[in-house]
């Protein structure tokens, strides 16, 4: 795996699934391929994206700044600086300085990532902030190692919370989770339908699922009534895809 492929993998792992993730993936590909060279426009686009947490925006802003060639005097962006200040915690800043000194001695991506993984997410963010604000310099490879270590920690905590959701036994939470997943699956079906001949059929199935979820939420239903709702929807989606000659692996 090349360095940039690895960076793209780690960064995308912390972004919630949806149309925005696909858009960000495209931006990263363009940036890494040298196709997008307007850093200012890129940062303006990033700043106004919905859904993303400030820290995720900070990490993406840091990656764009590292990768896109820019004029020397280009202003640093406040939204990135605020996201990478370690919540203003002086302990994070102290640890970030210690980490920075260690990173100065590293020359490889993997070496930097290994060193960085033993620090907290707050310290890692602060260390990125130091480099972003030009208070310290490391090689691009080392900076990418720092980015990937931060993403790995964030992805780990997200994975833990997903696992907790999967093992929750509270029927009300499970019921609501099934309905939310059914809604997002319906949305995906509508987006994939496009303008094909069978699009109307896919839209109809998605629409019925939405109406069912809406009705269940409006009148209130027994928590078990949503069981199988998302699975039925997925079966419909996969049958539709087979006819379209599209195979969507691991949608579940």
Swiss-Prot record:
Membrane topology: Peripheral membrane protein
One Gene Ontology CC term in the entry: virion membrane
Residue pairs linked by disulfide bridges in the UniProt entry: none
Subcellular location: Virion membrane; Host nucleus
InterPro entries: Flu_matrix_M1, Flu_matrix_M1_C, Flu_matrix_M1_N, Flu_matrix_M1_N_sub1, Flu_matrix_M1_N_sub2, INFV_M1
Coiled-coil parts of chain: none
Superkingdom of the source species: Viruses
GO molecular function per UniProt: RNA binding; structural constituent of virion
Annotated TM spans: none
Annotated stretches, region: Membrane-binding: 1-164
An example Gene Ontology biological process: viral budding from plasma membrane
Pfam family, one: Flu_M1
Spans annotated as RNP-binding: 165-252
Family assignment from sequence similarity: Belongs to the influenza viruses Matrix protein M1 family.
More about this protein: Most abundant protein in virion. When expressed alone can form virus-like particles in transfected cells.
Described purpose of this protein according to its UniProt entry: Plays critical roles in virus replication, from virus entry and uncoating to assembly and budding of the virus particle. M1 binding to ribonucleocapsids (RNPs) in nucleus seems to inhibit viral transcription. Interaction of viral NEP with M1-RNP is thought to promote nuclear export of the complex, which is targeted to the virion assembly site at the apical plasma membrane in polarized epithelial cells. Interactions with NA and HA may bring M1, a non-raft-associated protein, into lipid rafts. Forms a continuous shell on the inner side of the lipid bilayer in virion, where it binds the RNP. Determines the virion's shape: spherical or filamentous. Clinical isolates of influenza are characterized by the presence of significant proportion of filamentous virions, whereas after multiple passage on eggs or cell culture, virions have only spherical morphology. Filamentous virions are thought to be important to infect neighboring cells, and spherical virions more suited to spread through aerosol between hosts organisms.
Subunit structure: Homodimer and homomultimer. Interacts with NEP. Binds ribonucleocapsid by both interacting with genomic RNA and NP protein. May interact with HA and NA. Cannot bind NP without genomic RNA.
Protein name, entry field: Matrix protein 1
Organism in which the protein naturally occurs: Influenza A virus (strain A/Goose/Guangxi/345/2005 H5N1 genotype G)
Lineage, uppermost ranks: Viruses, Riboviria, Orthornavirae, Negarnaviricota, Polyploviricotina
């Amino acid at each position: 795996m090349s360095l940039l492929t690895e960076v793209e993998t780690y960064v995308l792992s912390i972004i919630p699934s949806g149309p925005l993730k696909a858009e960000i993936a495209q931006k990263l590909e363009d940036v890494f391929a040298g196709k997008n060279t307007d850093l200012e426009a890129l940062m303006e686009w990033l700043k106004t994206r919905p859904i993303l947490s400030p820290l995720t925006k900070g990490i993406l802003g840091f990656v764009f700044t590292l990768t896109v060639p820019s004029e020397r005097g280009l202003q640093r962006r406040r939204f990135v600086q605020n996201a990478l200040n370690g919540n203003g915690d002086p302990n994070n800043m102290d640890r970030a300085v210690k980490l920075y000194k260690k990173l100065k001695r590293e020359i490889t991506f993997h070496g930097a990532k290994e060193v960085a993984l033993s620090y907290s997410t707050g310290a890692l963010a602060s260390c990125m902030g130091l480099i972003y604000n030009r208070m310290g310099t490391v090689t691009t490879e080392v900076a990418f190692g720092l980015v990937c270590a931060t993403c790995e920690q964030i992805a780990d905590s997200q994975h833990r919370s997903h696992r907790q959701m999967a093992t929750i036994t509270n029927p009300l939470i499970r019921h609501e989770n099934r309905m939310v997943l059914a809604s997002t699956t319906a949305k995906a079906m509508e987006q994939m339908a496009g303008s094909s001949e069978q699009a109307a059929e896919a839209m109809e199935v998605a629409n019925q699922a939405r109406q069912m979820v809406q009705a269940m939420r409006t009148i209130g239903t027994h928590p078990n009534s949503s069981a199988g709702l998302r699975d039925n929807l997925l079966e419909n989606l996969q049958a539709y895809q087979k006819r379209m000659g599209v195979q969507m692996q691991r949608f579940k």
